Swiss-Prot record:
CDD domains: OMP_decarboxylase_like. Its EC number is 4.1.1.23. The gene is pyrF. It is an enzyme of class 4 (lyase). The lineage of its organism: Bacteria, Pseudomonadati, Pseudomonadota, Betaproteobacteria, Burkholderiales. It comes from the Bacteria. This is Orotidine 5'-phosphate decarboxylase. It catalyses: orotidine 5'-phosphate + H(+) = UMP + CO2.
Length: 287
């Protein structure tokens, strides 16, 4: 089963477009974990168990593990996901970008060491920096396109005078990913919920690519506006027609992980995940 197959299956089984981002910060853990970095696995596994039937994907952010020398806990966590939620794909949020043998090692890390189903990548160094990942047929790769941070404008919203049509950089990335770079149907795009107009533009340029959309929850992105922009559904479009479009994966991290600082953190995370999932699904319904 390919990554895209897994996404669609999880979407159907859990009725969800929600991705829970796993960005563990020990200083924000409940008091009974006392900020203990050795409890990263325990904290994240509890979140996984509480939300596995509500999500389309899980997205662990590798830096939150590596900063605490907790890569073995990440390996253990992904192994736990395979047992507890085998139907839910795992997106390793690594944002790697390098060439040659270094990119080969990063790809090996993502898909062999951690066993992720997909990975986030920077396309800045061009197609040859992506090829080592695309050799893992059936795996997915999400390219940074229009990111949720304000500083993304510094590069992503600049016009490319030497490219036909003088597109903005993020538009050029979307076209390349939709076209010549997507040799095996493995690519997707990362587009922030904080920029709904640009999100709609990316969907128009890349209608068959899955979109990973961070920025709802703590970053302020609006669930309903995000779904409307990503689906680009005209009034009267049927639900069946919407189901044929490429998946969107809407990520929320901190709002779910830290919904409570008490012993009930996992139950609170479930409540927040359920509420977010239902908001997303309600926004999906055609007018």
């Amino acid at each position: 089963m390919t990554f895209l197959d897994m996404l669609r299956a999880a979407e159907r089984q859990n009725g969800s477009m929600l991705c829970v981002g796993l960005d563990p910060e020990p200083t924000r853990f409940p008091a009974h974990y006392s900020g203990d970095v050795s409890k990263i696995y325990d904290f994240c596994a509890a979140i996984v168990d509480a939300t596995a039937d509500l999500v389309m994907a899980f997205k662990p952010q590798i830096a939150y593990f590596a900063a605490h020398r907790a890569e073995p806990q990440l390996e253990r966590l992904i192994a736990h996901m395979r047992r507890a939620a085998p139907h839910v794909p795992v997106i390793l949020d690594a944002k790697r970008g390098d060439i040659g043998s270094t990119a080969e090692q990063y790809a090996k890390e993502a898909f062999e060491r951690y066993g992720a189903d997909a990975v986030t990548l920077s396309p800045f160094m061009g197609f040859d920096s992506l090829q080592p990942y695309l050799r893992y047929h059936g795996k997915g790769a999400f390219l940074l396109c229009r990111t949720s941070n304000p500083g993304g404008d510094d590069l992503q919203s600049q016009r490319l005078a030497s490219v036909e049509g003088t597109p903005l950089l993020y538009e050029h990335i979307a076209r390349l990913a939709q076209g010549p770079w997507n040799l095996n149907g493995q690519l997707g795009l990362v587009v922030g919920a904080t920029y709904p107009a640009e999100l709609e533009r990316v969907r128009a340029l890349a209608p068959t690519l899955p979109l990973l959309i961070p920025g709802v929850g703590a970053q302020g992105g609006d669930c309903a506006a995000t779904v409307r922009a990503a689906w680009r559904a005209a009034p009267g479009t049927s639900g069946e027609a919407l189901d044929t479009l490429a998946p969107i994966i809407v990520n929320s991290s901190r709002a779910i992980l830290y919904a409570s600082s008490g012993a009930d953190f996992a139950q609170a995370a479930r409540r927040e995940a359920l509420a977010t999932r239902d908001l997303l699904q309600a926004a999906r319904q055609p007018a």
